[in-house]
């Protein structure tokens, strides 16, 4: 008989009845892969303050681990059900509290907070408790797995560090540093000095250590490596500081920074009180700034006896560095190179290419074929080929890729500085099984880049180095034989990970004839930037500075003269106000001048962009030059005004694409053959320039306008929070991961790239450069500046070209007289020091040179004249260029066209005239012949006045800002400010002057004409009785040219001609347009009267009530005279008094 049904029992059975279906249905309804389920769990366990943050790469790794764990547990559960013997029971009372079954989680020695301990009102309150517990166990297993992996890496890392050769010398280095102020650590490649010495110092208790590197990429990689080797136990105590980027904080104890940044810090604080130890790495490379830093440290050490210095070098010329620092002790560490077999394969005489021929790629292909025949593909080992330049890399690349497509055993990759960052990173990827990498590199892989897995090296024995020719004033990229030290460095790349082979494509006798060491950079480059920095740091005369190896005296003198010509140094070689500011701008002098000059006018935004664009490498990729599709897509951005304006248009268009939410800037750049990384550099430089100009008061600070409504502000905060999370995720993930390369018919790519295809913008494909760009810059402000700059008026464009022209002067080129009859590629131009230059292939004028020709209706020459030498035109143009680079030809790089006559009158350092001023010679090499002498005199007088006003306004502005900074924003800073009204008036007058239409001839003087240009010193020793052109200036005979020195740049009547000797006595009647005076004047008297006429406009363009300057006495016969009729005061000779009275009759 069944038991009676009670309420309790019935209720219990009902609960069981209702619970049973739910328990049976739960496994079917619960889905771990459901997005809503995962979102709830991430809200509970993966918050911002947790170890794993939601959306991070670590979060994605956990879910992959979780899926594998679920499959494993499901398999284990199904096997357990088949052979389950029943639950065991404890027979011992003491073990009653232990679990009945073993679970691996009991070995996990950590715990995490569960949702119960966080409160029942959190986001996970709707989750079943049993599912939360199951998820928590999975999370514990994952953390335990990660911990075991970390301990495994730690053990491996400690073994690797202990195996480094320098590990046996750590205590010796510290002891030597304790006893001496300077220590030289010399170690061969692979000894570990760059990563281990900073850690030894940190472990020894040093807390302020700076380690300099010659390149930015080395600072980043070493800082990350040191942080990794310390397992981040020092946290933020290891950081790096480079241009535009820094991870340095108040807690940083070791900072890796570039040499240039350390010199800037010395410029601000000469004693470097913030550092205890300075490590100068790679001193053997003999870079310009490294040599200068050593000289600065030699002077600083006696003043800072507590400062320690470690010089780290390869085993190259160690005695030079030791003796420079009073025979500092040397700790020499052996390298860890495996045996390297050297094979000399000199080229035959018929295989040696001449200077005009391409490199013969056959010797390099024979090496590839020899490796294929001798070594089975199962033996790993890649090939590194050292070539002299990009042209040589391209030649060998084409031949090697053809060979690789036949054998399917090679992946050929180029490596040089002009490649995009993504293409450079491919050399670190892994080749598939049975395939080797063939890396074609310049000397960048000699010391700057270390590539693992290299077993074979091919050394061409050549290198291209930049040198400066002070006579021709050009940079020359020439091919040289390398030094023995460089040859050993290249050979060492083959023995880092195992026995290697080095193929030298030259004879052993050639190696013996090599120079032992490379030529220091200080002995072959222009020194103007270095001299300017030395003047700013007040380290004394550059001629007597104690360099480790002094530069050629001629290079120092050339640099000083160049800085004086640019206005950065005065006649006593002291810094001028503009020179002080130029020394603080991290750009060439000409680019810095553009920024300073442009800050005066309302053209700050376009000048900032152009200056930044001219300060980086060309953003146009090398392959895009021959790609018709890229050229067609880029054509709307090209400007017929010149390359700076083309770069200006490219940057503005890119900013517009960036500001569009649906815009794909990477695709936009690729279609136009533009390297986006260069555009990011432009944006960073532009911001830095703007901040520097704002700091010096030359540019008003931008007002950041916040979004008006609360929703927009909230949306902006969310976007920045997401960007910060993406950046943190990238940094935690270690950046770019190595990929597996795959063979393709036209080159190579990575498997990951192929998988992404057109979906490269997915969430898991983070463009870290784009993230940093949006965090660093205000995109709305950039877009507004780009939009306004696209609508430059004609006046703004003319004024902008004027600023660029003055900034680039004296870097001018004049077109050859026969260019109109030449092909586009044969256009020839001449500079003052170099004849026969041509346009660079990337120049916009190389494809459309007709805009530089003076012909048709704009020119009126003699009938039948085809060469343009006798053309009278008001449209003659000059090319202002940023640099002159000679490779196989001398090329003009980054050119802009400017009007010839007005530019020469405003910029020339020397202007010489004949008697009636119809013939002018600028800087002793360009001749201007004007048909109308009256127009010539009028233009000359106007240019004199405008130059004086411009110089005065610029000097007052710079001097006022310098005084303001010096007196810390005091109200009375001495010199008057430059008012906006004055700047606006000066701009209007400059534009009117530039718009003047005066026909003239332009030609370059021959060498013989330049030698017989001047009349020479005259027997007349006194100046004519003429009022001065300026307030305190007086006329005096020029001691060498002859004629009369009107100003420091204008010499009147000094050019040879039949009438020049008597022209100062030849007068013609002229009526003053201001006071109506009608009398005979010489051209010089007319200029003088126009500048001192009481009825003429005041000298101050911005002051309407400015009183005229009092006349200055320039002759012994002049006496003060007050006219009763007109009420004016004059300084007149008796004859001039009679003339003045006659005009009132």
Swiss-Prot record:
Residues 370-538 form the Helicase C-terminal domain. Its EC number is 3.6.4.13. GO terms for molecular function: ATP binding; ATP hydrolysis activity; RNA binding; RNA helicase activity. InterPro entries: DEAD-box_helicase_OB_fold, DEAD/DEAH_box_helicase_dom, DHX34_Znf-C2H2, HA2_WH, Helicase-assoc_dom, Helicase_ATP-bd, Helicase_C-like, P-loop_NTPase. PROSITE patterns: HELICASE_ATP_BIND_1 (PS51192), HELICASE_CTER (PS51194). Pfam families: DEAD (PF00270), HA2_C (PF21010), HA2_N (PF04408), Helicase_C (PF00271), OB_NTP_bind (PF07717), zf-C2H2_DHX34 (PF24485). A motif (DEAH box) lies at residues 281-284. The keyword tRNA processing does not apply. GO terms for biological process: positive regulation of phosphorylation. It comes from the Eukaryota. Keywords: ATP-binding, Helicase, Hydrolase, Nucleotide-binding, Phosphoprotein, RNA-binding. The modification Phosphoserine is found at residues 749-750. Residues 1-27, 726-764, 1091-1114 are annotated as: Disordered. It catalyses: ATP + H2O = ADP + phosphate + H(+). It is an enzyme of class 3 (hydrolase). Residues 174-334 form the Helicase ATP-binding domain. ATP binds at residues 187-194. Belongs to the DEAD box helicase family. DEAH subfamily. PANTHER family: ATP-DEPENDENT RNA HELICASE, ATP-DEPENDENT RNA HELICASE DHX34-RELATED. Probable ATP-binding RNA helicase. Required for nonsense-mediated decay (NMD) degradation of mRNA transcripts containing premature stop codons. Promotes the phosphorylation of UPF1 along with its interaction with key NMD pathway proteins UPF2 and EIF4A3. Negatively regulates the nucleotide binding ability and ATP hydrolysis of the RUVBL1-RUVBL2 complex via induction of N-terminus conformation changes of the RUVBL2 subunits. Forms a complex with RUVBL1 and RUVBL2. Part of a complex composed of SMG1, DHX34 and UPF1; within the complex DHX34 acts as a scaffolding protein to facilitate SMG1 phosphorylation of UPF1. Interacts with UPF1, MOV10, EIF4A3, XRN2, SMG6, SMG7, SMG9, UPF3A, UPF3B, CASC3/MLN51, XRN1, DIS3 and DCP1A; the interactions are RNA-independent. Interacts with NCBP1/CPB80; the interaction is RNA-dependent. Interacts (via C-terminus) with SMG1; the interaction is RNA-independent. This is Probable ATP-dependent RNA helicase DHX34. It comes from Mus musculus (Mouse).
């Amino acid at each position: 008989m069944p038991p009676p049904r009670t309420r309790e029992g019935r209720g219990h059975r009902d609960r069981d009845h209702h619970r049973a279906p739910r328990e049976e249905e739960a496994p079917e309804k619960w889905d771990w892969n459901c997005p809503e389920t995962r979102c709830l769990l991430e809200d509970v366990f993966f918050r911002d303050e947790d170890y794993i943050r939601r959306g991070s790469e670590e979060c994605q790794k956990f879910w992959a681990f979780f899926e594998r764990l679920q499959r494993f547990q499901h398999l284990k559960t199904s096997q357990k059900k088949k052979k389950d013997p029943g639950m065991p029971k404890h027979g011992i009372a003491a073990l009653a509290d232990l679990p009945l079954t073993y679970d691996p989680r009991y070995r996990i020695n950590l715990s995490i907070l569960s949702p119960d301990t966080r409160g029942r009102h959190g986001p996970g309150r709707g989750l079943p408790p049993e599912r939360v517990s199951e998820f928590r166990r999975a999370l514990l297993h994952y953390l335990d797995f990660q911990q075991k992996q970390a301990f495994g890496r730690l053990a491996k890392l400690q073994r690797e560090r202990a195996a480094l050769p320098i590990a046996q010398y750590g205590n010796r280095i510290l002891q030597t540093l304790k006893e001496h102020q300077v220590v030289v650590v010399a170690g061969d490649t692979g000894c570990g000095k760059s990563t281990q010495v900073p850690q030894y110092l940190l472990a020894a208790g040093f807390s302020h250590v700076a380690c300099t590197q010659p390149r930015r990429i080395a600072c980043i990689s070493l800082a990350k490596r040191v942080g990794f080797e310390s397992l981040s136990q020092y946290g933020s105590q290891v950081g790096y500081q480079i241009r535009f980027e820094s991870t340095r904080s108040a807690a940083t104890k070791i900072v890796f920074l570039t040499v240039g940044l350390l010199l800037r810090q010395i410029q601000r604080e000469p004693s470097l009180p913030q550092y205890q130890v300075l490590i100068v790495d790679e001193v053997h490379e003999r870079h310009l700034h490294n040599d200068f830093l050593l000289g600065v440290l030699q002077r600083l050490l006696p003043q800072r006896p507590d400062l320690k210095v470690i010089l780290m070098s390869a085993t190259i010329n160690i005695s030079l560095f030791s003796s420079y620092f009073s025979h500092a002790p040397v700790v020499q560490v052996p390298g860890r190179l495996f045996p390297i077999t050297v094979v000399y394969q000199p080229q035959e005489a018929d295989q040696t290419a001449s200077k005009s021929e391409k490199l013969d790629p056959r010797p390099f292909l024979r090496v590839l074929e020899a490796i294929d025949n001798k070594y089975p593909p199962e033996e790993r080992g890649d090939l590194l080929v050292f070539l002299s330049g990009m042209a040589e890399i391209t030649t060998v690349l084409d031949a090697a890729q053809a060979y690789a497509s036949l054998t399917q055993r090679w992946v050929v990759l180029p490596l040089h500085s002009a490649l995009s960052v993504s293409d450079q990173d491919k050399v670190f990827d892994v080749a598939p099984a049975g395939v080797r990498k063939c890396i074609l590199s310049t000397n960048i892989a000699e010391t700057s880049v270390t590539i693992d897995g290299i077993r074979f090296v091919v050394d061409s024995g050549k290198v291209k180095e930049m040198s400066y020719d002070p006579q021709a004033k050009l940079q020359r990229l020439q091919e040289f034989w390398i030094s023995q030290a460089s040859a050993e460095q290249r050979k060492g790349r083959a023995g880092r990970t195992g026995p290697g082979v080095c193929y030298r494509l030259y004879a052993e006798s050639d190696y013996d004839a090599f120079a032992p060491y490379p030529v220091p950079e200080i002995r072959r480059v222009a020194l103007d930037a270095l001299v300017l920095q030395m003047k700013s740091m007040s380290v004394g005369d550059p001629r007597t500075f104690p360099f480790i190896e002094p530069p050629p005296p001629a290079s120092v003198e050339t640099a000083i003269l160049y800085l004086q010509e640019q206005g950065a140094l005065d006649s006593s070689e002291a810094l001028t106000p503009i020179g002080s500011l130029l020394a603080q701008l991290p750009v060439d002098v000409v680019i810095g001048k553009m920024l300073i000059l442009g800050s005066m006018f309302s053209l700050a935004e376009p000048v900032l962009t152009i200056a930044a664009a001219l300060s980086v490498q060309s953003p146009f990729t090398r392959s895009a030059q021959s790609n018709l599709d890229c050229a067609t897509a880029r054509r709307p951005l090209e400007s017929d005004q010149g390359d700076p304006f083309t770069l200006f248009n490219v940057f503005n268009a890119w900013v517009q694409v960036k500001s569009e939410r649906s815009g794909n800037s990477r695709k936009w750049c690729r279609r136009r053959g533009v390297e986006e990384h260069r555009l990011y550099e432009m944006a960073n430089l532009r911001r830095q320039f703007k901040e520097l100009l704002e700091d010096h008061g030359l540019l008003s600070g931008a007002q950041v306008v916040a979004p008006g409504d609360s929703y927009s502000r909230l949306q902006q905060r969310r976007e920045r929070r997401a960007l910060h999370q993406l950046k943190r995720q990238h940094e935690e993930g270690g950046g770019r991961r190595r990929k597996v390369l795959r063979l393709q018919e036209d080159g190579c790519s990575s498997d990951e790239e192929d998988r992404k295809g057109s979906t490269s913008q997915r969430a898991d494909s983070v463009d870290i450069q784009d993230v940093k760009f949006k965090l660093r810059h205000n995109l709305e402000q950039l877009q507004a500046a780009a939009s306004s700059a696209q609508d430059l008026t004609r006046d703004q464009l003319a004024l902008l070209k004027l600023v660029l022209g003055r900034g680039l002067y004296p870097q001018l080129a004049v077109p050859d007289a026969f260019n109109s009859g030449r092909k586009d590629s044969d256009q020839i131009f001449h500079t003052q020091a170099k004849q026969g230059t041509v346009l660079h292939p990337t120049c916009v004028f190389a494809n459309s040179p007709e805009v530089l020709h003076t012909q048709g209706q704009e020119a009126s020459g003699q009938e039948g004249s085809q060469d343009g030498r006798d053309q009278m035109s008001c449209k003659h143009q000059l090319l202002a260029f940023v640099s002159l680079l000679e490779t196989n030809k001398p090329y003009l790089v980054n050119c802009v066209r400017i009007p010839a006559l007005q530019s020469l009158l405003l910029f020339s350092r020397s202007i010489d005239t004949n008697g009636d001023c119809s013939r002018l010679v600028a800087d002793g090499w360009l001749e201007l012949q004007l048909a109308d002498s009256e127009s010539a005199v009028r233009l000359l007088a106007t240019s004199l006045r405008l130059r004086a006003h411009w110089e005065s306004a610029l000097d007052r502005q710079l001097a006022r800002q310098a005084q303001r900074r010096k007196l810390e924003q005091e109200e009375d800073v001495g010199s008057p400010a430059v008012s906006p009204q004055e700047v606006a008036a000066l701009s209007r007058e400059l534009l009117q002057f530039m718009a003047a239409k005066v026909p003239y001839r332009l030609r370059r003087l021959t060498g013989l004409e330049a030698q017989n240009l001047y009349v020479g010193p005259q027997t007349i020793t006194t100046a004519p009785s003429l009022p001065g052109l300026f307030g305190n200036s007086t006329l005096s005979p020029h001691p060498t040219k002859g004629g009369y020195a009107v100003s420091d740049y204008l010499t009147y009547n000094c050019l040879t001609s039949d009438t020049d000797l008597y022209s100062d006595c030849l007068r013609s009647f002229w009526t003053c347009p201001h006071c109506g005076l009608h009398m005979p004047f010489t051209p010089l008297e007319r200029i003088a009267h126009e500048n001192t006429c009481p009825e003429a406009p005041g000298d101050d363009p911005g002051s309407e009530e400015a009183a005229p300057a009092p006349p200055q006495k320039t002759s012994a016969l002049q006496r003060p005279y007050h006219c009763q009729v007109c009420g004016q005061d004059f300084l007149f000779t008796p004859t001039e008094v009679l003339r003045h009275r006659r005009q009132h009759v």
